[in-house]
Amino acid sequence: MGGVFLLLSKISFYGTTLILIVLILVLSLKFNKKTENKIIEEVSNEYMASYFDGEYQTEIPGKNDGYVVDKIVCDNGAVGEWDNEEWGINIRNATQKIKCSVYFKKALTILGKVIEDESQIATNDPDNNIRYVGAEPNNYVYFNCSNYSNQNDSTCEKWRIIGEFNNITKADGTKENLTKIIRNDSLGNFSWDYKQNGVGTSISTYGSNDWTDSQLMMMLNTTDYLKSGYTIENSVVKDSNSQAIYQNMGSYYNGASGCKPASITSGSSFSCTSIDFTSTGLQNDLTRNAIESVVWNLGGANEYNSSVNGLASHWYGYERGITIYSGHATTWIGKIGLMYPSDYGYATSGSSMQNRTLCLSKELYNWNSIADCYNNDYLYNSNLNQWTLTSSSTSAYNIMNVYALGNVLSTFSYYSNYSVRPTLYLKSSISISKGDGSSSNPYQLKLN
């Protein structure tokens, strides 16, 4: 007989029912194919069948082989529960001859960590990306640490893992699956852009919604990502006509003093309103080198106020499309961006009253009327109006926002009372070393 051994661990009575709990330890397996296309191993009065992704196999996967148990089906009233630590099965109510089938499936992982509670994730966006969902999923991660050898609330910031995204195009043109994270707390309130008519890409008094030369982009990113044709003279950023646009580009990225996005008119000099990022900006090169430079999609939206054009799935398509205001860029290469409207929409878990499917069938424009959708979304904050990266394609200056009321609307890019939550992709070489992702025990990263 093949080597499956039952180690008796407990026998006890509850009422008149005998509860027999046994642990099956798999040392080696020699299965026999049955007529019902199952693989069965008999040991005494117990039988066990093994399936990987719905197909029977001749062995059970090892603990570190990248599989998790999908379900266990036992007959004759027995109940099987999988012990992930011991990598074995606990069987209850084994009062007679039983057969248990154990179904394994490929584990979902983020940063090398197997997601054991799959109720906290979803994979149903158009590209089957793995996303965390819910009001408070275990997706906290320490990042931007002053000391990665001693990661805690004092040495690190808390960020949230949005998810793992498939086939992200990197700056060198290659594609990888990369993990996107967002700062848990707002960096502060800033204008998205406040360039006036004739300055850079602006053609209005309300700023420009072209991210490639927005003042917010310049505040967050290093000079490596300055728009082609633009120059820097004595720390002043100038457009292709040598008009001043901004000053001290990259202050957040470099953890230095810089300037807030501010009004600048054609023919005038930029007047810096100082902002100090020495404590809230990126702290060191370990952090900076952990961020992947990628292609960010800048597609915009036209109509989005109904269920035929404003669902999270529609936004996902708009963001990756080429519909933008005339002359504006459809993509941008850089490190620090913002969340998308679709990130917000897909992060909901819904509730027992209004489940996720129903939330995703409702336009984000009207989510303010569905508390079960936005209250069960960790990207929502009732105290913040949050900038996104996505623009209006019919306007040269409107940007989409996640409002404190829970819906997604557009507003002028020059407004200064909207919150910024830096968002970025981690390099694929980075993994989780410890932690459980809760707010009290965030994941800790191993930076290579």
Question: Could you describe each region identified by the protein language model?
Answer:
Residues 1-6:
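Short, Lys/Arg-enriched N-terminal segments with co-localized hydrophobic residues
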Residues 11-73, 77-448:
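Long, domain-scale functional regions
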